[in-house]
């Protein structure tokens, strides 16, 4: 009897271990989703998830919020994307990088270490996009070539210290591997940097084949698809942000692109019907 119990216990332990291995190997976390679009593989990584407060969209009628079912908050996320294209693996943005950040564990679930990241493209310099680049004073992605808009870089470097402290510190830490591009430039991986300015001075969208990494083009998809003229308080130049939002959405719709947005609701992919 004792032998039978020991054997049964061993089988249960082995089964549990195998299930754990299977889960780790074959079942990605709920914050990860990969889509293949043409010759490009895009993996969504949810650094964090939350709703956007309706209050960040001033002037929106309560009746509209009620009709859309978002009066208590607009579904959103804090996301990054990993793109594999033309033999290159590129990380777009790094999330908030503070307690609760999921980026590094999610990369680990894919078998990717921070030092494996060779290319890091930035949509803009807000803290929830560059925050994961540093851990205190330590560089998180020591082998990454960092690409950012020249317009974005120059604008932030010339802001008052109380606004640009994080951006200055972060860019300084990566200065030996920092590459500044102009809108329209083609970057490694045959990825085109597109003008999406307005949210920030050099806010950038990235065209990767049939996928478009749209950055912060929309913070509240449910609302801004209906009213693209509505801006969150985070948009620095609201007129430019509206123009960029309408242009990017129109371009994506016309060309049948997969939109990938850092604050789209999970999973942060969107394709608009023509």
Please give the residue ranges for each predicted region.
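Bacterial N-terminal signal peptides that target proteins for export
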Residues: 1-8
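Conserved beta-strand hairpin/beta-sheet module of binuclear metal-dependent hydrolase folds
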Residues: 28-109, 205-218
């Amino acid at each position: 009897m004792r032998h039978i119990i020991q054997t049964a216990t061993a089988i249960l332990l082995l089964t549990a271990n195998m299930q754990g291995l299977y889960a780790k190997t074959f079942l990605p976390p709920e914050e990860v989703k990969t889509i293949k679009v043409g010759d490009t593989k895009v993996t969504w990584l949810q650094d964090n998830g939350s709703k956007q407060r309706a209050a960040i969209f001033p002037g929106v009628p309560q009746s509209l919020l009620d009709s859309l079912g978002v009066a208590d908050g607009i579904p959103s996320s804090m996301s990054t994307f990993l793109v594999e294209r033309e033999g290159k693996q590129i990380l777009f943005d790094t999330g908030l990088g503070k307690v609760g950040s999921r980026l590094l564990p999610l990369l680990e679930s894919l078998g990717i270490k921070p030092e494996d990241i060779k290319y890091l493209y930035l949509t803009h310099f807000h803290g929830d996009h560059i925050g994961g680049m540093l851990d205190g004073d330590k560089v998180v992605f020591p082998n990454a070539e960092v690409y950012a808009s020249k317009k974005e870089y120059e604008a932030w470097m010339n802001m008052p210290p109380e606004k640009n402290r994080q951006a200055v510190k972060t860019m300084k830490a990566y200065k030996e591997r920092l590459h500044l591009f102009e809108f329209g430039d083609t970057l490694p991986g045959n990825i085109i940097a597109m003008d999406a300015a307005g949210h920030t001075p050099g806010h950038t969208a990235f065209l990767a084949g049939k996928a478009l990494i749209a950055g912060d083009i929309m913070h509240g998809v449910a609302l801004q698809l209906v009213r693209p003229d509505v801006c969150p308080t985070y948009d620095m130049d609201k007129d430019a942000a509206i123009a960029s939002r309408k242009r990017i959405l129109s371009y994506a719709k016309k060309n049948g692109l997969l939109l990938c947005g850092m604050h789209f609701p999970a999973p942060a992919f969107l394709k608009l019907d023509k």
